[in-house]
């Protein structure tokens, strides 16, 4: 029987989507295995160790701990401060999102990098900077006798400092791609400026605002370093309480219960976040972001720009400037020179070695995060992914919300026997850092991959190209910039990871955040000066990496960050 060429092509075209679906499912094997071994297994090991004693389960500890008044108070404060921090961050950052989306002004790329620096700094550095600003003997204390340390206001301000970039990049990135002509058309039909914004722009932005708010709530709900340093013994979040129960009281059963409570809360937050992300990816009329920014016109727009710049200067730049000033307090760059020797006996090596260690660890973590995150993003490319893949997408975000203290301690407990006896291996630190980097890689690459015209892939497959060749010759050229940006962001985040690394970094191989924390934990002006110097170096490295990302990004919106 003769078969026409057209029938062959139709058969190939029908087989291509089925083959693509099988390949996408196959791509999930590596990410699933990675998260199962290096995330689910260590966290489960901590929970099991805490709730299983002498071979018997102590389920009653769940109710004993959860019903305690102290835990209820911690849970209430954790939720309350997260909600207040989220509301305050949105109030302060949404005008900034508009300015970065719609205004063109000199130094915009540099300023965008500057506002992102706090997001990737370790909390111990930020806590130290705010102590120098609002604590005893700080700038505000010297000038006006005002102290905010050990108050909830210091915690809230530091959370806004951290999460300002989340709102600016998530909401501003979409805002820059909305067609301003739609709002202008509404005004031509007689709508006021506010009515046009409320009926046209706000509905389009609502999913992005909701997604940003949920991410800010997640980050502040799991806050650790900021609350521990600025809140003192008065305030405690679930994360701080887990750390206290684990490392100070050695009550693993209480820590396990608190971890489960946090896990349940984070799971609910991420489920809602996944739904808002899908809504955000609905049909919108998007345009090139580079064509929507204009020079401010009129007194109102110039005043708005000035107000945003003033806010950035006071809230974001001033704490960083105080950090630099404290590092230069010793004449002749004395604090920086002291990094070459460990006169205080804090380390087995000079503190300056932490710079090289951090760069090496971050490079390895970036490679792992890009590989795992890239495979995961490719597997999630289809918009009409089934429930299994949608669940997988949500689970990829879990490392951002589950206690880093639990993960780090879980590594030490779970990965201690063959075939995964890694306790003495240097790879533990990059693995822990990569867990935090993978979600950012996915969130940056996924929207770009979904924007690739599926017909290009299908045409290449019909012509006989293998899935690997389709990805190499169709997807890769189109997503190369997003891939580089994802790698850079993973690198910056890995540099600042502290919660898990503090458990895993060996004394002879400290990272910059761990070195800063150890120096701050020792008395003396020399140790404090070295801590400020290392913090400044870390800040400058992160700023340089983010500035390169902004150069790569140009005027285009790339993913969610």
Regions found by a protein language model. Give the residues of each.
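C-terminal transmembrane helix and the adjacent membrane-cytosol boundary/short C-terminal tail
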Residues: 2-12, 22, 27, 107-108, ...
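N-terminal signal-anchor/first transmembrane alpha helix
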Residues: 2-45, 109-115, 262-263, 267-271, ...
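Membrane-interfacial helix termini and adjacent extracytoplasmic/periplasmic loops
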Residues: 11-17, 59-60, 64, 72, ...
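Interhelical loop and adjacent transmembrane-helix boundary motif
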Residues: 18-24, 64-70, 221-267, 271, ...
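Transmembrane alpha-helices
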Residues: 30-34, 87, 117, 121, ...
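Transmembrane-helix boundary motif in ABC transporter permease subunits
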Residues: 84-115, 128, 182, 196-201, ...
């Amino acid at each position: 029987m003769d078969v026409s060429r057209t029938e062959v092509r139709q058969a190939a075209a029908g087989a291509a989507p089925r083959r693509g679906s099988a390949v996408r499912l196959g791509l999930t094997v590596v990410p699933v295995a990675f998260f199962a071994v290096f995330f689910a297994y260590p966290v489960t090991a901590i929970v099991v160790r805490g709730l299983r004693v002498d071979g018997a389960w102590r389920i009653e500890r769940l109710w004993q701990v959860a019903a305690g008044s102290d835990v209820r108070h911690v849970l209430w404060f954790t939720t309350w401060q997260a909600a207040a921090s989220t509301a305050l961050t949105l109030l302060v950052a949404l005008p900034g999102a508009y300015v970065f989306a719609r205004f063109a002004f000199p130094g915009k790329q540099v300023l965008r990098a500057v506002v992102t620096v706090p997001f990737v700094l370790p909390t111990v550095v930020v806590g130290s900077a705010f102590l120098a600003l609002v604590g005893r003997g700080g700038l505000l204390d010297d000038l006006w006798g005002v102290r905010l340390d050990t108050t909830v206001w210091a915690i809230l301000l530091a959370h806004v400092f951290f999460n300002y970039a989340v709102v600016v990049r998530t909401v501003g990135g979409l805002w820059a791609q909305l067609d301003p002509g739609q709002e202008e058309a509404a005004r031509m039909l007689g709508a006021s400026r506010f009515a046009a914004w409320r009926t046209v722009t706000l509905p389009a932005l609502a999913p992005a605002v909701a997604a940003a708010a949920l991410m800010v709530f997640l980050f502040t709900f799991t806050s650790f370093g900021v609350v521990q340093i600025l809140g003192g013994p008065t305030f405690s979040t679930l994360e701080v309480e887990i750390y206290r129960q684990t490392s100070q009281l050695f009550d693993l059963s209480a820590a396990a219960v608190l971890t489960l409570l946090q896990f349940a809360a984070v799971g609910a937050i991420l489920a809602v976040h996944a739904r808002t992300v899908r809504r955000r990816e609905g049909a919108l009329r998007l345009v090139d972001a580079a064509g929507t920014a204009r020079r401010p016109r009129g007194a109102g727009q110039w005043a708005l720009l000035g107000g945003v710049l003033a806010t950035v200067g006071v809230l974001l730049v001033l704490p960083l400037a105080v950090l630099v000033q404290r590092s230069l307090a010793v004449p002749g760059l004395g604090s920086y020179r002291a990094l070459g020797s460990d006169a205080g006996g804090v380390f087995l090596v000079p503190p300056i070695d932490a710079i090289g260690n951090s760069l090496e660890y971050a490079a390895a973590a970036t490679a792992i995060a890009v590989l795992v995150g890239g495979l995961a993003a490719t597997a999630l490319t289809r918009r009409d992914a089934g429930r299994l893949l949608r669940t997988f997408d949500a689970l990829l975000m879990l490392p951002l919300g589950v206690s880093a203290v639990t993960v780090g301690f879980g590594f030490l407990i779970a990965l201690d026997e063959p075939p995964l006896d890694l306790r003495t291996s240097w790879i533990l630190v990059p693995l822990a850092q990569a867990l935090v980097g993978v979600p950012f890689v996915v969130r940056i690459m996924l929207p770009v991959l979904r924007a690739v015209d599926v017909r290009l892939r299908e045409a290449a497959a019909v012509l006989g190209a293998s899935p690997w060749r389709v990805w190499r010759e169709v997807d890769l050229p189109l997503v190369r910039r997003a891939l580089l940006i994802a790698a850079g962001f993973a690198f910056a985040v890995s540099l600042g990871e502290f919660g898990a690394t503090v458990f895993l970094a060996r004394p002879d191989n400290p990272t910059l955040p761990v070195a800063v924390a150890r120096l701050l934990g020792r008395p003396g002006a020399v140790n404090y000066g070295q801590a400020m110097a290392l913090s400044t170096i870390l800040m400058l490295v992160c700023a340089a990496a983010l500035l390169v990302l902004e150069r790569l990004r140009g005027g285009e919106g790339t993913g969610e960050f």
